[in-house]
Amino acid sequence: MKNFITILFLTAGLFLNAQYYSITFVNVPQENVAEFERLETTYWSKIAKHNIENGKQLNWGLVSRVGGGTDTWNYAFINVYETAEQMTDNSIWDPKSILGIDPQDISTNHLYSGMGITHWNVKASIQGTGNAAVWNFGRPANLAAFIDENQKLWGPAFEKDMGGRVNWGVGQKLNNIEQEYSTVMTWDSFESVADAIKFMNGEFSQPQVRNSKMTEIMPDGFTARVIVTDVMWAVD
């Protein structure tokens, strides 16, 4: 993804100054997809760009899920911020003052059947620009150890050998912390969806990491792994 968080969401390289990001997951029925994308890329991306130019956020992105069923999310928004104050300030989403358009005229709320929002803190990242990403969600038995090992072992290993990736990062979830939900995510970004699929199939050699305790830290592995592809970023 082009700038996941330099994102995202949660592919790309926007995390240089980012500390926080939110992901909004939505389920858009197929018959609404074209209108949903039109409104988001034509209007809401401009509002986000205005916010970015005025120092209120770092980036905004829209990605679509590759595959999946009709009963789950198929699009996600990624908003990237420097501070928690920025991330929780909903007043910045004001099309009337920014574009001179009434919010109801460009609302997409009626175009999706379900929505969920999560907030995250960036714990580690390596910059790069791609067009697709694998989002890996998990619930480690030891959250602090998971973050520490990614920062001290996996991050340095990927800096030497990205194993086909163009971007990588780790995020810790800050809300909706319940037993059935993930508490961390990592992202592996690639130049194309095809490369993301090859990665999932084990077709890229990966760096070797000594002294990893990840099988103890997260014995059940990732709880979900999803490929997403960029629709648009406010800042490429």
Task: Explain the meaning of each model-derived region.
Residues A18-D236:
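Short S/T/G/P-rich N-terminal loop/turn motif that feeds into the first structured element of a domain
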